[in-house]
Amino acid sequence: GREGVAVQIGAVISHEAGRKFRCPENDRIMLVAGMAAGFGGLFQTPLAAVFFAMEVIASGYMQYEALLPAMISAYTSAFTSHILGLEKFTAVIGEKLDLSETKVILSLIVLGILFGLVGRLFSGTLQWMKKRMGNAIKNPYIRIGAVAVFLAVLLFLFHGGRYSGLGTNLISAAFENGTIYGYDWILKLGFTVLTLAIGFQGGEVTPLFSIGASLGILAGNLLGISPVVCAALGYAAVFGSATNTLLAPVMIGLEVFGTENAIPLVVVCILAYLMNGGSSIYTAQQRAVLKLDGEKEAVSERGATEKQKNKAMRQ
């Protein structure tokens, strides 16, 4: 996968730049800017990159001082990669959901819940599987070697490698009127989780896009609304749920698919975010949330103590 690598490279470069120019007080801002540059340069979605970098460190907490530096780095990176020949993925939907229909409104609610649960399934299963695999086979080389043989056989048996790689083949099929099977999303999810759990290093973001898009096609057909619009909604919302981010999936949906279905996109992404239960594929993000919650509690306790002192002094 490229996303994880790109973000990590951007983060390391920005961190080292901050140290070199001796600005430790801006270390977190430099980190956000570097991550935004990595994401923005890869996907050429600078707005999504900015909010992804800000949200992925600590969900529910935004460091607004990092907004302008992150925007500068993300747009510069996206422009540079474009000049160097990297093509941005975009899809013309050409269809718009009619929000005056009750059926469409109810379908959006179902989609938001569905995509949220699937994103949660991905992140939760990944963390659980990593622990189980690590406990079952302690030696990482034996674990990777033994399970990889089994995995390779399965990948070959199921449509000759259809579920290997990043999943761009499923994304293309979803938006180019290709063949999407009803079980594509679950097999892609299972194989991706197993591959990462045994110790292979790879990306999660693009596979999440493919899982969401293929699930969206299935859901759209079952609900009787535009499958391609549902694929676009799933593309963004499953990613948002699995990464425990809200603004980033909304922005990536707008930048990749346009603004025709902006309201359905926002509604579905909000519902998916609410359904994920705080679960994330990035465990460091979860620790940051706990730390921030602890800080908030500490502040509240200090505030209560000060009030008690003031009351005692008045008495």
Model regions and ranges:
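Alpha-helical transmembrane segments and immediately membrane-proximal extracytoplasmic
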Residues: 2-315
